[in-house]
């Protein structure tokens, strides 16, 4: 999670969300940060998954895990299910748009083709601090 946090661009106008994907030996396969300025689907998770499937030359990421600083939204949670990521680790809960524990609960719905192992609250305070600072600065 520290790697995902460190990859966030705190000077960007985008929400400070970072994601990394590692293989079963914890080797980093991809890393991404939110980049939605010109592409509304440019969430960190989506970009990290695109990069990982390109790097590995596969459609499914069976033996990989994703670390994300914020609970995935419905779009990202569905993509995590489709790509069969083995483990999902995330930092802060997203009480407004979160789709794992907070709201929609994608992995418990019929929309979910696969449910990863889910670990939440990883370095939660550090992840929340990124968000608080970002939105406090936007309100100035």
Regions found by a protein language model. Give the residues of each.
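Zinc-dependent deaminase catalytic domain
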Residues: 1-140
